[in-house]
Structure formats: structure tokens, C-alpha cells
């Protein structure tokens, strides 16, 4: 189902958010 892709997307978003906070 789409739940697997959604969780993967959330994981990627959280990782990007962490890297953004690191850069700022």
C-alpha cells in the first residue's frame, strides 16, 4: 500500500529537516 511509501517519505523529510537545521 501507500503507507510504506508515506513512511519512507516522512523519514526523508525528517532527515532533510535535520540537515537544514544543521546548516542554519
UniProtKB/Swiss-Prot annotation:
Keywords on record: Cytoplasm, Secreted
GO cellular component assignments: cytoplasm; extracellular region
Signal peptide span: none
Principal location: secreted
GO molecular function: receptor antagonist activity
Localization: Secreted; Cytoplasm
Alphabetical list of InterPro entries matching this protein: Humanin
Keyword Phosphoprotein: no
Stored Pfam families: Humanin (PF15040)
One of the GO BP terms on file: negative regulation of execution phase of apoptosis
UniProt family annotation: Belongs to the humanin family.
Cited function: Plays a role as a neuroprotective and antiapoptotic factor.
Protein name: Humanin-like 11
Organism listed in the record: Homo sapiens (Human)
Amino acid at each position: 500500500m501507500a503507507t510504506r511509501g508515506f513512511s519512507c517519505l516522512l523519514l526523508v523529510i525528517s532527515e532533510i529537516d535535520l540537515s537544514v537545521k544543521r546548516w542554519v
